[in-house]
Amino acid sequence: MKRLICTVLAVAMMITGMAAFAESEGPRGGMGGPNGERGGGPNGERGGGRMGGGGQTDKSSDAELQAMITEVAPKFQLLTYEDSETGTTLQYQLYIPENYDENQSYPLVQFIPDASAVGRDADYVLTQGWGGLIWATEEEQAKHPAFVVVPVFTETVVDDNFNHSEQIEVAVRLIQSLTEQYSIDTNRLYTTGQSMGGMTSFYLNVSYPDLFAASLFVGSQWDNSILNVLEDDSFFYIVSAGDPKASVGQAGLMEVFDSDGAAYSHAEWSAQDDAETQNAAVEALLAEGNSANFVTFELGTTLAEGQTSGGGAGEHMTSFDYAYKIEGVRDWLFEQVKA
């Protein structure tokens, strides 16, 4: 049973020199993006602000991603949810399984991108990387027919000081609306996201502890003083050792688990390992039998050949896609069913 926790948000910052919330400037003048993310060129993100450094993640050479952008992105529908509670609207990208049968029950994956997608066109939440598209590929759908939803937020919905916006609650009601509209199994709802998206997924697990069957947190962190609720959850938490903030957050959460005597598994892998090696590593990790799984990419392994740094944010932005490329983790996610 999940624990009832007290939502206390004011904690000591994990990295000194962090700018205060009131001083931060987001992509649309709202909350500053986690780790200083700003919008950048096509298929890339540009660092800026607190953790940024002007570095850009150029994904034009990722042939698999470019193929997904061409072949998979057009299969999503751009729709608008009208929220009766707030009177506001929220756009979202929705993938409906091919040959959808209302007599069958389908899982749903929610992907939330990083803050560089805020203020961009609605297609960017898909084309920015692997996180939204991979679930809707023919290969994935052949194994795991599923709905995929990607909210198009118009403001930065969480920040480094653990503030959050009302749009998160609207996104929750969107999921609830989809489960009423389609034949979606409410025991197989999954959330994942990178940076701001991972932070949002942390927040959702704390605020709605019975909503998701499992989570995949990528390159992100949250207030560890309230994350002991995750000790009863099923998740993978993947960061790069070269991510100066998310790696600290991950280590801090493992300390919480240690302090409470909660079981978990942890492994360090090279992001450059081939698929067979990575999937074998996933199997070895899961063989330990724990529902909480932490993975740290070894320092420098998310950088492109010849790249010595990811900018001021280190290997933050460069680590996201590597996490979503791990087939064994994706397969594990769909095996999770809410008790």
Identify the meaning behind each predicted range.
Residues 3-22:
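Sec-dependent N-terminal signal peptides of Gram-positive bacterial secreted proteins and lipoproteins
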Residues 23-108, 199, 265-272, 339:
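A domain-start/cap signature at the N-terminus of enzymes
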Residues 52-53, 238, 242-245, 263-339:
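C-terminal catalytic histidine-bearing segment of alpha/beta-hydrolase fold enzymes
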Residues 99-100, 104, 158-195:
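Gly/Ser-rich "nucleophile elbow"/oxyanion-hole loop immediately N-terminal to the catalytic nucleophile
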Residues 108, 112-172:
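Active-site machinery of serine-nucleophile hydrolases
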Residues 112-119, 179-182, 194, 201-206, ...:
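Cell-envelope and extracellular/periplasmic
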Residues 180-181, 187-231:
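Primarily recognizes the serine-hydrolase "nucleophile elbow" in alpha/beta-hydrolase
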Residues 232-241, 254:
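Catalytic His-Asp charge-relay segment
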